[in-house]
Swiss-Prot record:
GO cellular component, one term: ribonuclease P complex
Keyword check for Amino-acid biosynthesis: no
Designated name of the protein: Ribonuclease P protein component
Cross-referenced PROSITE patterns: RIBONUCLEASE_P
Gene: rnpA
Oligomeric form and interacting partners: Consists of a catalytic RNA component (M1 or rnpB) and a protein subunit.
Coiled-coil region list: none
Organism annotation: Arthrobacter sp. (strain FB24)
């Protein structure tokens, strides 16, 4: 299970990461990654739509992707926001296939970020809402 500080939870955070992030797709997943403040913990969010399968299958895919995300936090513990979108093929994929696709897509997005690795100003920030005012 991912700690609360390591999860993307608001629709604003998801949409900002998907719109402005670096994207890389594989057979089973599409990853969007954006650099946030270097001192913020990395945060991961998951999108698993009904096209992946029924509730049982979707939850299995989410559990596997959450574990892959937790493993990646050991290497990229601070400074990134990541959104993982599961594709319909993920329903039939084994753990090894999902993990390989996740890691390959993550490595590619990190390389593409290049000089944009963690920056001082956060694109996705826990302290601001959509209007830009501090949270209470």
């Amino acid at each position: 299970m991912l700690a609360t500080r390591n999860r993307l939870r608001t629709s604003t955070d998801f949409s900002t990461t998907v719109r402005s992030g670096v994207r890389n797709g594989r057979r089973n997943v599409v990853l969007y990654t954006v650099a946030i403040a270097a001192d913020e913990p990395s945060r991961i969010g998951f999108i698993v739509s009904k096209s992946v399968g029924n509730a049982v299958v979707r939850n299995l895919v989410k559990r596997r992707l959450r574990e892959a995300g937790a493993l990646s936090l050991q290497q990229y513990g601070t400074g990134f926001a990541i959104v993982v979108r599961a594709l319909p093929a993920a329903a039939a994929a084994s753990w090894d296939q999902l993990l390989a696709d996740y890691n390959a897509a993550l490595e590619t997005t990190m390389k593409r970020l290049g000089g944009r690795l963690p920056r001082a100003a956060s694109v996705v920030s826990r302290e601001t809402r959509q209007e830009g005012t501090p949270r209470a």
